Amino acid sequence: MVFKKMLSAFGVGGPSVDTVLTNPNTRPGLTLDGHVNLVGGDAPASIEQITVGLVTRVEIEGGDTEYAGVMEFHRMAVSGPLQLAPKQQLSIPFQLPVPWETPVTDVYGQRLHGMTMGLRTELAVARAVDKSDLDQVAVHPLPIHERILDAFQALGFRFKHADLERGHIRGVQQTLPFYQEIEFFAAPQYAGTINEVELTFVTSQQGVEVILECDKRGGFLSAGHDAFGRYAVPHSDAGRTDWVQVVDGWLRETTSRYGNLRAHGFGAPHGHHGHRGSGMGGMVAGAALGMAGGLVAGELIEDAFEGDFGDFGGE
């Protein structure tokens, strides 16, 4: 018996956890539904808590370096303390609200290159090794996102890459500690003016703030630079607007200005991915995660889950 208790403390013969999602596809503002299925081990187990949380890969800039970390940004308790008998089977239903700002991972039925998202289940076991499970999740765009992305495609822009950048865009009300950048190669009719465009959605229950960063080409006597535009759109406009005309107007207005939205974060201004100008990094108030104590959104869990993410998303 003592030997079994010792093995259980190291996770041998302990309880197992497997989360089954009713549907792994969702959208910002909706829910993820499923069941956490438990099976008891060789000995009774005291479960302290069961939680589910959304995790994703985020680009983190520090000085002159940049690295990717895996971050849990939204968590919910599924169950409090309970006792699990040997070999007992238990299924616990849950419904996890998906934050409005959750980044989009899939468009037109395809995973965006550079994006990854998962639902992590954690089983906290008293006096034993905690157990966990990780399930792939696909976050699809809302109608307002789709209309704007459709307009970029109709205008001839080609998708390049998407990623998440740690930080907050100054002047924008964010609840998550990162923002998504969807990058496009310039359409032919804009190629003489800009090289690339980065599109950011910051979504709320009322609508979406659209942030554009245009990498402007330099002229014979002028250097290239970044230009920024910011536009607020209600969800109700999704189906009653000529989005091709609107997005074209946004781009022309944005490229006519020079860095009007730029605001410095902590430290000297730095280039996005270190390759040009002051970039979106200049707009970002790059508050270090964890400054707001106890904020689940700021929990980096790279070491525990880097291996688990290798099978999906990624580059």
Model-flagged regions — what are they?
Residues R75, A124-Q153:
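Short beta-strand elements
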Residues M1-G11:
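A eukaryote-biased signal for short, well-structured alpha-helical docking elements
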Residues E66-G109, V129:
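A beta-strand/beta-hairpin structural motif
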Residues G41-E48:
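A short beta-turn/strand-edge loop motif at beta-sheet boundaries
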Residues G53-R57, Q95-E101, G109-A128:
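Internal, hydrophobic beta-strand segments that form the core of beta-sheet-rich folds
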Residues A154-A223:
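Extended serine/threonine-enriched, polar tracts that run as long, contiguous segments within proteins
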Residues V55-A68, R217-A223:
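Short aromatic-acidic-glycine turn motif
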Residues P269-G314:
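Short, low-complexity, glycine-enriched hydrophobic/amphipathic alpha-helices that associate
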